[in-house]
Amino acid sequence: MGQALFLTVLLPVLFGVGPEAYGEASHSHSPASGRYIQQMLDQRCQEIAAELCQSGLRKMCVPSSRIVARNAVGITHQNTLQWRCFDTASLLESNQENNGVNCVDDCGHTIPCPGGVHRQNSNHATRHEILSKLVEEGVQRFCSPYQASANKYCNDKFPGTIARRSKGFGNNVEVAWRCYEKASLLYSVYAECASNCGTTWYCPGGRRGTSTELDKRHYTEEEGIRQAIGSVDSPCSEVEVCLPKDENPPLCLDESGQISRTGGGPPSQPPEMQQPADRSDERGGGKEQSPGGEAQPDHPTKGGNIDLPEKSTSPEKTPKTEIHGDSTKATLEEGQQLTLTFISTKLDVAVGSCHSLVANFLDGFLKFQTGSNSAFDVVEVEEPAGPAVLTIGLGHKGRLAVVLDYTRLNAALGSAAYVVEDSGCSSSEEVSFQGVGSGATLVVTTLGESPTAVSA
């Protein structure tokens, strides 16, 4: 049948670019996680715990997977927010009053994440200076200049807020660019941020669409944030296609889809937030002092709790269709790709009569079938939870490539992909989607554009 199965990413498949240009492809690596600084901190904390264990501190002799970095208070007398290495077994399942914990996004902003500190019986080591330095270094590597500009716009207008494209107050309010109070966001919920090409992709720090008092703490600034993003110079020339990367700078592709060069380095990052002072306490105890420059929860000025919707007059660079209902159709031409962003337990897709696939999140698999073949090939999908992004690309002579990026139960990102060399598909096929769920969006782009770029 000429089928070949690869775990890879879409652009190298269709353009023949080697994996070394994009990083090693695997289930554990997926673009735009927005969690790389947090992963750096977790890894450093695991090293610190191992060092403390070797030095004789037995309570830190625990499996490395239990050690994480969190910005939080400590035991009873440690009342300031500092970076600490926690044994997750000592954390509470939920926070109460002022014992919440925070994780960090790739622009250095702390956002509430699951868990709470047991003030009387916490097993942690405070390493504020070491971890704060890693945050500063990580911002230069991973913070998109476009997202930094959007954050600066929000912070200048409403001090203490950051930019996200997410939900507002209640589930019926449409997704839009807003300036959010950080304490009102959830690190475990994905929103959209600006990539280092100016397109949007997923990042931590979103809203569930609930109707609590915290859900009121934002300002809708669609036009202003879009203008802030648009004010950043493109890293690629007008004749090149910008390919976002997790780490700055992005890649620039020529008209044939080959890498022509690496995009220009990121501009100096705006002072989006005051970094916590580089201080740490002794692990054995002692009264913790509150550093003067330590970041505390910020609140919007002028009363907060105000939603000022504004309609954007700036056209989107990538046309996007918001789907109303549980199904939709689109035409896929040779040299194009369809990207569907959805939250659903099961998605059925038919590419004309030449190819079909099923993404089943309940049973954890992506299966596909080509032409008249009655048997399905299956690709494992590990612990899927959602949201998910499905990209289908049609190359030369019916070459079909499919990539499914999804959120896992542990809030990490997963990816599954396959390629059919000779699918039997023509140069133009109608693609139908069934079971897309509510709030799905569909975008048609040319090959070479970011698979997750669902809007400008």
UniProtKB/Swiss-Prot annotation:
Signal sequence annotation: 1-16
Annotated region (MAR domain), positions in chain: 17-262
One GO CC annotation: cytoplasmic vesicle
Region feature (Disordered): 247-330
Interaction with host sialylated oligosaccharide chains as annotated region, ranges: 124-126, 216-220
Alphabetical list of InterPro entries matching this protein: MIC1_C_sf, MIC1_galectin-like_dom, Micronemal-adhesive-rpt_sia-bd, Microneme_MIC1
Any Pfam family hit: MAR_sialic_bdg
GO BP terms: cell adhesion; effector-mediated perturbation of host innate immune response by symbiont; effector-mediated suppression of host innate immune response; immune system process; symbiont-mediated perturbation of host receptor-mediated signal transduction
Compartments it resides in: Cytoplasmic vesicle, Secretory vesicle, Microneme; Host early endosome
Gene disruption phenotype: Significantly reduced invasion efficiency. Reduced production of IL12 in host cells during infection. Slightly reduced virulence of parasites in mice. No significant effects on parasite gliding motility. No significant effects on parasite attachment to the host cell prior invasion.
Region (Beta-finger region that is required for the interaction with and correct trafficking of MIC4): 237-256
Disulphide linkage map: C45-C85, C53-C61, C103-C113, C107-C143, C154-C179, C193-C203, C197-C242, C236-C252, C354-C425
Main location: cytoplasm
Span of the annotated motif CXXCG: 103-107, 193-197
UniProt keyword list: Cell adhesion, Cytoplasmic vesicle, Disulfide bond, Host endosome, Immunity, Lectin, Signal, Virulence
Molecular function GO labels: carbohydrate binding; host cell surface binding; sialic acid binding; Toll-like receptor 2 binding; Toll-like receptor 4 binding
Activity-regulation annotation: Sialyllactose inhibits binding to fetuin, a host glycoprotein. Lactose and D-galactose (beta-galactosides), but not glucose, mannose, fucose, melibiose or heparin, inhibit hemagglutination induced by MIC1.
Effect after changing T220A: Abolishes binding to host cell surface. Reduces binding to fetuin, a host glycoprotein, ability to activate host bone marrow-derived macrophages and dendritic cells and virulence in mice
Keyword Disulfide bond: yes
Phenotypic consequence of T126A: Abolishes binding to host cell surface. Reduces binding to fetuin, a host glycoprotein, ability to activate host bone marrow-derived macrophages and dendritic cells and virulence in mice
Annotated Basic and acidic residues bias: 308-327
Summary of subunit composition and partner proteins: Monomer. May form homotrimers. Part of the MIC6-MIC1-MIC4 complex. Interacts (via the beta-finger region) directly with MIC4 (via the second apple domain). Interacts directly with MIC6. Interacts with murine TLR2; the interaction promotes activation of bone marrow-derived dendritic cells and macrophages in the host. Interacts with murine TLR4, the interaction promotes activation of bone marrow-derived dendritic cells and macrophages in the host.
Role description: Soluble adhesin with carbohydrate-binding activity. Binds to sialic acid-terminating oligosaccharides. Required for attachment of the parasite to the host cell and subsequent invasion. Ensures correct folding of MIC6 and transport of the MIC6-MIC1-MIC4 complex into the micronemes. Facilitates the correct targeting of MIC4 to the micronemes. Triggers the activation of murine bone marrow-derived dendritic cells and macrophages and production of pro-inflammatory cytokines, such as IL12 (IL12B/IL12A), in host TLR2/TLR4-dependent manner.
Notes on the domains: The galectin-like domain has been demonstrated not to bind lactose, glucose, maltose, mannose, heparin, fucose, L-arabinose, N-acetyl-D-galactosamine, or N-acetyl-D-glucosamine. It interacts directly with the second and the third EGF-like domain of MIC6, and with part of the acidic domain.
Name this polypeptide is given: Micronemal protein 1
Natural source organism: Toxoplasma gondii
